[in-house]
């Protein structure tokens, strides 16, 4: 394979990855907990953008319950975002399993 052609392909892939990163920074995923009474929205690059808590699940005498629900739902949103990001990157890299940190 011609080295110039290979370099051009690498540049195209880098441009595609940069565009995908921008897209993922604005693409959101939402998860729900507590039977829909807790909703967390996050970008696919891991930033939380919305947290909705139904007042009916707030019990001042049992704050640990709410803390646990929040952690579970936030972690689920982050995991869902990572899965979405990984699927998008896999499309761009043609299924190559690149190590973490390689351009993302």
Swiss-Prot record:
Q: What is this protein called?
A: Nucleoid-associated protein Amuc_1227
Q: How does it assemble?
A: Homodimer.
Q: Does the UniProt entry include the keyword 4Fe-4S?
A: no
A GO molecular function held by the record? DNA binding
Any one Gene Ontology cellular component term annotated for this protein = cytosol
Q: Which family does it belong to?
A: Belongs to the YbaB/EbfC family.
Q: Which HAMAP family has this protein been placed in?
A: DNA_YbaB_EbfC (MF_00274)
Q: What keywords tag this UniProt record?
A: Cytoplasm, DNA-binding
> Origin, by domain of life?
Bacteria
InterPro entries according to UniProt: YbaB-like_sf, YbaB/EbfC
Q: What does this chain do? A: Binds to DNA and alters its conformation. May be involved in regulation of gene expression, nucleoid organization and DNA protection.
Keyword Cell wall biogenesis/degradation (UniProt): no
Subcellular location(s) per record:
Cytoplasm, Nucleoid
Q: NCBIfam families, per this entry? A: DNA_YbaB_EbfC
């Amino acid at each position: 394979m011609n080295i110039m052609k290979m370099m051009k392909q690498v540049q195209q892939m880098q441009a595609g990855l940069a565009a995908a990163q921008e897209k993922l920074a604005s693409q959101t995923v939402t998860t729900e907990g507590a039977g829909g009474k807790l909703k967390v929205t996050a970008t696919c690059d891991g930033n939380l953008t919305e947290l909705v808590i139904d007042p009916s699940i707030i019990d001042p005498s049992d704050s640990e319950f709410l803390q646990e629900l929040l952690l579970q739902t936030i972690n689920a949103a982050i995991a869902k975002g990572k899965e979405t990001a990984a699927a998008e990157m896999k499309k761009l890299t043609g299924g190559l399993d690149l190590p973490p940190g390689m351009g993302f």
